[in-house]
Amino acid sequence: MVRRSLYFLAVMGVVRSSSGLYIPSVVLQELGIASSQGCLMIAETNNGNFGIVSSGLENPVYITESPQGHREVSWQPVRGEDRAVPIYAPSAEEVRESISSVRGSEPGQYIAPQPTGFVPASTPVFGTIESASTAGAAVPVEGVFVASTENPASTGSSSTSTCPPKGTAGTTDNKGKAGGAAADDKSKSSSSSSSKKKKKGAKSLVALGAVATTALFSIVM
């Protein structure tokens, strides 16, 4: 089976001891010119240079798999004594095995990026929650908390209470509730009045800006 493709561009590169492997623009231009002339290959000429040549439709290049199961390929040269390497697209397994490790000393398998290293912000995180014991000392209690600013969840019945202590008499407790409600009403009324004042001030600024713009246009005209 002949596998001809332009994906395996590394075969068309030029190897130099100083600069390594690269693909010059001349090679790409020759590839575009010869692509309509049958099977393409890299051929070594008599002077030792490599170039893109076309084998022609009458002399195709055959690529056969090794009977031992190896992924190495063999080909039939079509340029006499010149050596020719056919251009073909490697399989996914060949690409994986050709990629070396980070150090470059041992061959490694290609591993696609995995989403396991990314943790969303809403994912519960296991940690230690400190709770107050009966003696007043902080005792670590295992629990679950969510890294969020809204509605933090906590578990355990021995969590520290933030409510004010209850009074000894029922009248005192009722007075405290009434005082708290009155304070809440006052704070709500003050916040609403301040927001109304801010809105009125913004409207007056907008009106003043409109008047100034109209006056400026009338002066210019």
Curated annotation (Swiss-Prot):
Record's subcellular location: Spore wall; Membrane; Cytoplasm
Prosegment location in residue numbers: 193-221
Biased composition (Low complexity): 154-173
Principal location listed in the UniProt entry: other
Keyword Lipoprotein listed: yes
Signal peptide from the UniProt entry: 1-20
Membrane topology: Lipid-anchor; GPI-anchor
Recorded superkingdom: Eukaryota
Region (Disordered): 150-203
Gene Ontology CC entries for this record: cytoplasm; side of membrane; spore wall
Lipid addition sites, GPI-anchor amidated serine: S192
Keywords of the record: Cytoplasm, Glycoprotein, GPI-anchor, Lipoprotein, Membrane, Signal
Function comment: Spore wall component.
Name recorded for this polypeptide: Spore wall protein 3
Organism the protein comes from: Encephalitozoon cuniculi (strain GB-M1)
Originating gene: SWP3
